[in-house]
């Protein structure tokens, strides 16, 4: 079992390496800097021999005259290499995290709806934000610890003497200076931390909008828009992180330089006869070693494996998502605009993970330009039929045709470009009203076209009352708008899209009577010259449909016009009687 685990960890790291490899130049520079850093410590320790043997053993003061300059030079070199190694490793880490996030984000946008049905939004957000950050632990944190501590283990032990009493008055003099440096850096840290927290919120919000509005992204072809939006905030997050690293990395060399000046003062003071007579070689050795210990922060090797394993575990969860199969897009047929003829032939469909079919042997024709309404009790399969038209799910048996061709013959982009969707659960993005109406295609439509769509959707009356009109930011998922206003923006979006096929999935079910009247007028405008599939619980909204289809337990049980179905005294008549009390 142990060997299997080791093999799994190694395989995971090998798979992660291609993500790190493009930034290996940063690793090489960091490695060289770490080696020079360790070499400076080793050379510093080697100075103890001439110090003890010549400087004190033979009272050759010339050694103590040139050694301060060497020490200062070594400390400057150490500070520079420490900064370079920390910055380069963190640069690689930031690039790796950003690359993983972009891969995850792009992969998730290509996942089928069934994937999101089985996953919670919080879990997926955690994968994009937290787990991808954990990858840095394996690609940078553990790496820098192992290399640095492996190359300079003696330096780590010496750091235990950082607060040694032997530093005596020198540390007392240094304390206020170090305190000021720490206070200045701490303020910088707080400022950057706030910016990082705000930016992380933007990253999470961007990802959450894509995840919650996945269907809208697919229908309106908004993958590129969402990718650009996510890339922007993700890169902003990376830059904030680099500012934090820069401030952190430069603070250590400053403190180290202060300590090196103190060391130089100790050595210079020791060259005076009055001072030399009161010191022993052992005392100088302790002070010297303690000052060296100040040059490097204490790094612990005890938690490296745990840190590395956390990173590998995060990699495995991310790779599990990246290994998930995306939507099958094997069709080749591309069209500009469909006529709008739809037909279901012996369609049977079962949701993934379930055994009982949601639809059984569905046969349905919707001629171009006609309106067909689906009615039935909750859970009867009405919305499932609509989801199959857009290929959010693929059927088990039968065929669904558009203009005489199976839907699977079309590319997904071409197919979904023919369909506009208005549902009861409208998803709006944290953007302007205009950009929401022209979602994913803002460059294709003029301002006049957007305004005309809003006017036809009876939305301009409330838009004109907003502070910035069409340029008003409406908040996350349109939180600043009422239900009716959100519905009208969705209708304006569908009008502007001008697709030949329209799906209305209980578009007015959650509205009050006044809002429903305004929206119904907009829907009537929207349905003109389009093939429409309406799903409704309120039977009053579908009485004028060309055909009403009654679905019960995944089977079509009745079909006909409103008057014909009432005359049959069947399921539709019962539903009508229940609603209107007749």
From Swiss-Prot:
<dbReference type="InterPro" id="IPR039421">
    <property type="entry name" value="Type_1_exporter"/>
</dbReference>
<feature type="transmembrane region" description="Helical">
    <location>
        <begin position="253"/>
        <end position="273"/>
    </location>
</feature>
<dbReference type="GO" id="GO:0005886">
    <property type="term" value="C:plasma membrane"/>
</dbReference>
<keyword id="KW-0812">Transmembrane</keyword>
<keyword id="KW-1278">Translocase</keyword>
<dbReference type="InterPro" id="IPR011527">
    <property type="entry name" value="ABC1_TM_dom"/>
</dbReference>
<feature type="domain" description="ABC transporter">
    <location>
        <begin position="342"/>
        <end position="578"/>
    </location>
</feature>
<dbReference type="InterPro" id="IPR036640">
    <property type="entry name" value="ABC1_TM_sf"/>
</dbReference>
<dbReference type="GO" id="GO:0015421">
    <property type="term" value="F:ABC-type oligopeptide transporter activity"/>
</dbReference>
<dbReference type="GO" id="GO:0034040">
    <property type="term" value="F:ATPase-coupled lipid transmembrane transporter activity"/>
</dbReference>
<dbReference type="GO" id="GO:0005524">
    <property type="term" value="F:ATP binding"/>
</dbReference>
<dbReference type="InterPro" id="IPR017871">
    <property type="entry name" value="ABC_transporter-like_CS"/>
</dbReference>
<feature type="binding site">
    <location>
        <begin position="376"/>
        <end position="383"/>
    </location>
    <ligand>
        <name>ATP</name>
    </ligand>
</feature>
<dbReference type="InterPro" id="IPR011917">
    <property type="entry name" value="ABC_transpr_lipidA"/>
</dbReference>
<keyword id="KW-0067">ATP-binding</keyword>
<dbReference type="InterPro" id="IPR027417">
    <property type="entry name" value="P-loop_NTPase"/>
</dbReference>
<keyword id="KW-0997">Cell inner membrane</keyword>
<feature type="transmembrane region" description="Helical">
    <location>
        <begin position="275"/>
        <end position="295"/>
    </location>
</feature>
<keyword id="KW-0445">Lipid transport</keyword>
<dbReference type="Pfam" id="PF00005">
    <property type="entry name" value="ABC_tran"/>
</dbReference>
<keyword id="KW-0813">Transport</keyword>
<feature type="domain" description="ABC transmembrane type-1">
    <location>
        <begin position="28"/>
        <end position="310"/>
    </location>
</feature>
<comment type="subunit">
    <text>Homodimer.</text>
</comment>
<dbReference type="InterPro" id="IPR003439">
    <property type="entry name" value="ABC_transporter-like_ATP-bd"/>
</dbReference>
<keyword id="KW-1003">Cell membrane</keyword>
<keyword id="KW-0472">Membrane</keyword>
<feature type="transmembrane region" description="Helical">
    <location>
        <begin position="16"/>
        <end position="36"/>
    </location>
</feature>
<keyword id="KW-1133">Transmembrane helix</keyword>
<protein>
    <recommendedName>
        <fullName>ATP-dependent lipid A-core flippase</fullName>
        <ecNumber>7.5.2.6</ecNumber>
    </recommendedName>
</protein>
<keyword id="KW-0547">Nucleotide-binding</keyword>
<feature type="transmembrane region" description="Helical">
    <location>
        <begin position="64"/>
        <end position="84"/>
    </location>
</feature>
<comment type="function">
    <text>Involved in lipopolysaccharide (LPS) biosynthesis. Translocates lipid A-core from the inner to the outer leaflet of the inner membrane. Transmembrane domains (TMD) form a pore in the inner membrane and the ATP-binding domain (NBD) is responsible for energy generation.</text>
</comment>
<dbReference type="Pfam" id="PF00664">
    <property type="entry name" value="ABC_membrane"/>
</dbReference>
<feature type="transmembrane region" description="Helical">
    <location>
        <begin position="153"/>
        <end position="173"/>
    </location>
</feature>
<dbReference type="InterPro" id="IPR003593">
    <property type="entry name" value="AAA+_ATPase"/>
</dbReference>
<dbReference type="GO" id="GO:0016887">
    <property type="term" value="F:ATP hydrolysis activity"/>
</dbReference>
<comment type="similarity">
    <text>Belongs to the ABC transporter superfamily. Lipid exporter (TC 3.A.1.106) family.</text>
</comment>
């Amino acid at each position: 079992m142990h060997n299997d685990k080791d093999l799994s960890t190694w395989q995971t790291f090998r798979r992660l390496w291609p993500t790190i490899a493009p930034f290996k130049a940063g690793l090489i520079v960091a490695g060289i800097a770490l080696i020079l850093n360790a070499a400076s410590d080793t050379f510093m320790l080697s100075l103890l021999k001439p110090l003890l043997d010549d400087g004190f053993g033979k009272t050759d003061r010339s050694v103590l005259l040139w050694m301060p300059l060497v020490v200062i030079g070594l400390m400057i070199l150490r500070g520079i290499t420490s900064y370079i190694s920390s910055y380069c490793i963190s640069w690689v880490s930031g690039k790796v995290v950003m690359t993983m996030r972009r891969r995850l984000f792009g992969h998730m946008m290509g996942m089928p709806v069934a994937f999101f049905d089985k996953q919670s939004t919080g879990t997926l957000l955690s994968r994009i934000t937290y787990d991808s950050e954990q990858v840095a632990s394996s690609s940078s944190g553990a790496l820098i610890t192992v290399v640095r501590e492996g190359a300079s283990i003696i330096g780590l032990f010496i750091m235990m003497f950082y607060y040694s009493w032997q530093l005596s008055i020198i540390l007392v003099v240094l304390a206020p200076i170090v305190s000021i440096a720490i206070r200045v850096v701490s303020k910088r840290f707080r400022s950057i931390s706030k910016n990082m927290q705000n930016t992380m919120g933007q990253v999470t919000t961007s990802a959450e909008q894509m995840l919650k509005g996945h269907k809208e992204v697919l229908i309106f072809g908004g993958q590129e828009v969402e990718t650009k939006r996510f890339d922007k905030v993700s890169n902003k997050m990376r830059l904030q992180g680099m500012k934090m690293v820069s401030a952190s990395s430069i603070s250590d060399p400053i403190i180290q330089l202060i300590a090196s000046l103190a060391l130089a003062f100790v050595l210079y003071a020791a060259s005076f006869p009055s001072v030399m007579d009161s010191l022993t070689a052992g005392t100088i050795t302790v002070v010297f070693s303690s000052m060296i210990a100040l040059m490097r922060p204490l790094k612990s090797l005890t938690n490296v494996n745990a840190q590395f394993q956390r990173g590998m575990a995060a990699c495995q969860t991310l790779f599990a998502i990246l290994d998930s199969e995306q939507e099958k897009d094997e069709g080749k047929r591309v069209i500009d605009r469909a006529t709008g003829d739809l037909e279901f032939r012996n369609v049977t469909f079962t949701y993934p993970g379930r055994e009982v079919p949601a639809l059984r042997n569905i046969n349905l024709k919707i001629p171009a330009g006609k309106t067909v309404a689906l009615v039935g009790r909750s859970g009867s399969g009405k919305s499932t039929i609509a989801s199959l038209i857009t290929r959010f799910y693929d059927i088990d048996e039968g065929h669904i045709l558009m203009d005489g061709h199976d839907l699977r013959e079309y590319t997904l982009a071409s197919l979904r470009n023919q369909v506009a969707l208005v549902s009861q659960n409208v998803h709006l993005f944290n953007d302007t009203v205009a950009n929401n109406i022209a979602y994913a295609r803002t460059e294709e439509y003029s301002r006049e076209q957007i305004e005309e769509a809003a006017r036809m959707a009876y939305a301009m009356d409330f838009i004109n009352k907003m502070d910035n009109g069409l340029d008003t930011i409406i908040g996350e998922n349109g939180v600043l708008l009422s239900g009716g206003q959100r519905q009208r923006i969705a209708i304006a979006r569908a009008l502007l899209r001008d697709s030949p096929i329209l799906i209305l999935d209980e578009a007015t079910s959650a509205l009050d009577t006044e809002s429903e009247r305004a929206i119904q007028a907009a829907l009537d405008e929207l349905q003109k010259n389009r093939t429409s599939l309406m799903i409704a619980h309120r039977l009053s909204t579908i009485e004028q449909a060309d055909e009403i289809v009654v679905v019960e337990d995944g089977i079509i049980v009745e079909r006909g016009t409103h008057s014909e179905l009432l005359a049959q005294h069947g399921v539709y008549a019962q539903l009508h009687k229940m609603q209107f009390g007749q």
